[in-house]
Amino acid sequence: MLPSRDPAGRRREIDPLALYASAIDTSDYVAQVAPLVRRSVPVIGDLLDVGAGGGQLGHALREPEGRWAAIEPSPSMRVRLSALDHPPQLVAAGWNEAGVPPERHDTVLAATMPATMDEPEAFLARCRSWTRRTVVWVVPAHAGPRGLCFAGCLPLEWHGEDETPGIDIVLRGLSPSSMPRHVSFADWTFTGIVPDLDELAS
């Protein structure tokens, strides 16, 4: 949680996941990424969305006749996912503790998941165990920070984060036999609407 203050000066918390999810709502992320995934995976089938967050991409990719399940450890994101029309079956756990049966889903999706960069080989093995057919990872390919979601508006010397493109980190962490069969790139624009800039900056 990020500390902030309400109009009366009382300290309150800003949920960074909710902040990021709201920015994805107003960005063209899904409009640009979902068609690219569909071209590579024309039949999604039963979908497992790992680290689903706000569920925007999974919701766009899910097929009406297929099952959609979401592994999501964040309570606030699970509330958000539950409010969707046709919400996914929720698994309240992290990826390494999730009790999802093996080979239960046709497609396993992991979009902007830290595990793809932190533990790519172990995470890929887990994803492969869950799928009957396809694993799809969406990782950042831009040179920029990956921590605070508005840090990209700041110079490097202000935010101090590593700006190595996520795809470089992922590929560096995978063994030769684990390299992806197909890689595609999408250009999209991160658009966050901030009702109170002073509140966010405090």
Residue ranges and their predicted role:
Residues 100-107:
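A short acidic, Gly/Pro-enriched loop at the edge of an enzyme's catalytic core
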Residues 107-119:
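A short SAM/SAH-binding and catalytic strip from SAM-dependent methyltransferases
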Residues 121-136:
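A short glycine-rich, Lys/Arg-flanked "PGG" loop and its adjoining helix->strand segment in the class I
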Residues 162-201:
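Substrate-binding/catalytic lobe of Class I Rossmann-like enzymes that use SAM or dcSAM, i.e.
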Residues 1-42, 44-53, 136-162:
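Conserved class I S-adenosyl-L-methionine
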Residues 54-97:
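Class I SAM-dependent methyltransferase SAM/SAH-binding core
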